[in-house]
């Protein structure tokens, strides 16, 4: 195929698609140019059906640092494992694409998106989602698309599609919505406590833009699309299915209705094992034994799936006996752990999450370096899902895509209510440990996170709660479920997570297994979620009504001091020598910003006070008129040097020692004497002159008009002292003042 180019203008930017020039051995490949962003999207499919009992779809999103004109970091100086943002983008693309393949499609499919050039004002993730759908659509892969996605911002009471970087800075909403021409099938959002009505409007506004992109894809497919390949779909033997259903359906249906999760799982497992054992014995010598037994396992899964859905849609009964809008029993507890900076334990039925708060200096913020300009991330929310939480053994190690995604969802929900850095200058980390799971563990982690933040004294604007909504639909009728459990998530059509405060929504996430849902379903789910959210907030607030006024004793305390910008180098010292010494001596952590704000962190207030005193002395400057009681550190013929503070000395000229004439300095003071002096002059070089006599009573004049003895004049000069030159803590030393008579 020769290169063909298609172009449209979308939201004020050119959207150009090139087909037939690159990656021609793949099933489908397109180059998408949106503004100055360029993404290569490639789709490939295996020739045969995979042996897995699921659809093996893999979506990758690769950020090449050269796309932004940046050099990769690290020792190897090349791209390594995907960043968190890249992982999340891959999930965003996977979620709306996956439902668009036929039931029983088991061929392995890979979709690879590579960002080749990057324009921060033209969304690379949305270009990649568009390219992924189009690469599949023009290929021979049996994909029932196309789909498209857009970003939606909300500022000045207006919605902005695919906002620029500057638009995002002022937006109250960060929404990504995807779908087909007919319906929405994926949502991901963070919001600043927006109402359900505004969120629904944003979703519908986004869907209008999606329709335009889908039309453009259909136009391209009509021009260059390949004929779809004939592939074998996984199907069970119809006669075998009818036979098993006739004998075992009622038995399995009874097991499904056992209310307690572990008991229900044991009951359904017993039925399935009985059926499987029967057919293993019956077909022990059959050459198609493996195929038959595979079909038996799939048929039993389909029977359980059908019964769960029938119970809900026809009988309006859920497997655990709840009403469709009923939440499982709730419990909230704070201070579950000693020593930590804050902790919260939240339980909803058989789902339980422990959240642990850690506060740290701002120097511990995470440095994020990707295609966007480097920035520091202050708030981290990490989510861990060990297999013991569902009573199983399994892989234990680094977090997978699901754990990363759930962690960021909680981060998005809670970030909206955190105090500003000016109000609360701490880096904040929450870790959610899922201890038990029967669905909606990500939302339990949000509730537990709220408890930990409030218990730890973080002054959040309002508590946040999360709830997961479900859907069972037969194409004509549907039922929206509140607080779905694992079985309903597994066999249902939708997982719609809604988090927020009493004022509004802070996060949304929706995944579905059908091609899309209508605005009516969205509206009902949001309204039902609001009622549930308020019920959960009642329980959270009964455990702790508002954030504590003080941090935990183990949390780092903070104090600050403002220093002149030109003194920053004094506090830091050569190669960090001075600040390192302060930290070593006091055990504190010190942050200094470019405007001279010094923040001192420690769990020991005395250590903070010591460090603050040292820093104050380092940057301290004498002022004319100040009075000090200080030691005499050096004697010269022309006067005495006294040590004011740090490395700052002052000269008390011989004429300023006493009102009467002084022949020798030693007649008045000696090294080591403590004297009280007043600063009388600071010259342009910072040299300090002080006086003792100005603080003494002035004697009355005698008959000759002199103060006591004959007043004599002397001319002498003094030089910069070196008595304290070895100290590291002095910003400056006094030089000798000019000759005085």
UniProtKB/Swiss-Prot annotation:
Residues 698-713, 723-741 have a biased composition (Basic and acidic residues). Belongs to the polyribonucleotide nucleotidyltransferase family. It catalyses: RNA(n+1) + phosphate = RNA(n) + a ribonucleoside 5'-diphosphate. Pfam families: KH_1, PNPase, RNase_PH, RNase_PH_C, S1. This is Polyribonucleotide nucleotidyltransferase. One of its GO terms (molecular function) is polyribonucleotide nucleotidyltransferase activity. Its EC number is 2.7.7.8. CDD domains: KH-I_PNPase, RNase_PH_PNPase_1, RNase_PH_PNPase_2. The keyword Transferase applies. It is found in: Cytoplasm. It is an enzyme of class 2 (transferase). Residues 556-615 form the KH domain. It comes from Streptococcus thermophilus (strain ATCC BAA-491 / LMD-9). Its cofactor is Mg(2+). Residues 696-741 are annotated as: Disordered.
């Amino acid at each position: 195929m020769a290169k063909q180019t298609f172009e449209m203008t979308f939201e004020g930017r050119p959207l150009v698609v090139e087909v037939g020039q690159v990656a021609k051995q793949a099933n489908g490949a397109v180059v998408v140019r949106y503004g100055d962003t360029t993404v290569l999207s490639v789709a490939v499919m295996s020739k045969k059906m995979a042996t897995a009992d699921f659809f093996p779809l893999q979506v990758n999103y690769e950020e090449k640092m050269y796309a932004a004109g940046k050099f990769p970091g690290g020792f190897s100086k090349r791209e390594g494992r995907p960043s968190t943002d890249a992982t999340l983008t891959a999930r965003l693309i996977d979620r709306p694409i996956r439902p668009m393949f036929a039931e029983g499609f088991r061929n392995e499919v890979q979709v690879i998106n590579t960002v080749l050039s990057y324009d921060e004002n033209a969304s690379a993730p949305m270009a990649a989602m568009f390219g992924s759908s189009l690469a599949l659509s023009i290929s021979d892969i049996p994909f029932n698309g196309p789909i498209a996605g857009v970003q939606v911002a909300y500022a000045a009471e207006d919605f902005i599609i695919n906002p620029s970087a500057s638009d995002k800075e002022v937006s109250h909403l960060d929404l990504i919505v995807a779908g087909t021409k007919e319906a929405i099938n994926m949502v991901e959002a963070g919001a600043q406590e927006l109402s359900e009505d505004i969120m629904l409007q944003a979703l519908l506004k986004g869907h209008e833009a999606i329709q335009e992109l889908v039309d453009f894809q259909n136009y391209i497919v009509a021009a260059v699309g390949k004929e779809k390949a004939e592939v074998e779909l996984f199907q069970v033997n119809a006669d075998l299915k009818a036979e098993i259903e006739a004998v075992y359906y009622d038995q399995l249906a009874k097991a499904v209705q056992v209310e307690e999760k572990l008991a229900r799982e044991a009951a359904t497992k017993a039925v399935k094992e009985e059926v499987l054992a029967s057919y293993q014995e019956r077909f022990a010598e059959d050459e198609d034994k493996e195929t038959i037994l595979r079909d038996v396992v799939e048929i039993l899964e389909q029977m359980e799936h059908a019964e769960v859905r029938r119970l809900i849609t026809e009988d309006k009964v859920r497997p655990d006996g709840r009403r469709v809008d009923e939440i499982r029993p709730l419990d909230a507890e704070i201070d579950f752990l000693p020593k930590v900076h804050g902790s919260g334990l939240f339980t909803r039925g058989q789902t339980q999450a422990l959240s642990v708060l850690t506060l740290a200096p701002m120097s511990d913020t995470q440095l994020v370096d990707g295609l966007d300009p480097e920035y520091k991330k202050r708030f981290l929310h990490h989510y861990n899902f060990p297999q013991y939480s569902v009573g199983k053994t399994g892989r234990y190690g680094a977090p997978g895509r699901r754990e990363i995604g759930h962690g960021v969802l909680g981060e998005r929900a809670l970030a909206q209510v955190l105090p500003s850095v000016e109000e609360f200058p701490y880096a904040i980390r929450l870790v959610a440990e899922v201890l038990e799971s029967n669905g909606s563990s990500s939302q339990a982690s949000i509730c537990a996170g709220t408890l930990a933040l409030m218990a730890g004294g973080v002054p959040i604007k309002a508590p946040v709660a999360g709830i997961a909504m479900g859907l069972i639909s037969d194409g004509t009728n549907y039922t929206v479920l509140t607080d779905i459990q694992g079985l309903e998530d597994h066999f249902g059509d939708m997982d719609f997570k809604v988090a927020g405060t009493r004022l509004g929504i802070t996060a949304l996430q929706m995944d579905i297994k059908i091609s899309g849902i209508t605005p009516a379903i969205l509206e009902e789910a949001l309204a039902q979620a609001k009622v549930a959210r308020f019920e959960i907030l009642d329980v959270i607030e009964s455990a702790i009504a508002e954030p504590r006024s003080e941090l935990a004793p183990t949390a780092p305390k903070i104090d600050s001091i403002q220093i002149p910008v030109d003194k920053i180098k004094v506090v830091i010292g050569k190669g960090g020598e001075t600040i390192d010494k302060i930290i070593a001596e006091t055990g504190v952590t010190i942050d200094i910003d470019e405007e001279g704000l010094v923040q001192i962190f420690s769990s020991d207030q005395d250590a903070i006070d010591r460090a603050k005193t040292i820093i104050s002395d380092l940057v301290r400057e004498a002022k004319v008129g100040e009075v000090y009681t200080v030691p005499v550190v050096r004697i010269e013929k022309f006067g005495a040097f006294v040590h004011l503070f740090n490395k700052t000395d002052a000269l008390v000229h011989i004429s300023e020692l006493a009102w009467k004439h002084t022949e020798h300095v030693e007649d008045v003071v000696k090294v080591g004497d403590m004297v009280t002096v007043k600063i009388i002059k600071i010259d342009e070089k910072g040299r300090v002159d002080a006086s003792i006599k100005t603080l003494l009573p002035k004697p009355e004049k005698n008959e000759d008009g002199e103060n006591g003895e004959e007043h004599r004049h002397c001319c002498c000069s003094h030089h910069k002292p070196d008595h304290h030159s070895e100290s590291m803590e002095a910003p400056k030393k006094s030089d000798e003042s000019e000759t005085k008579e």
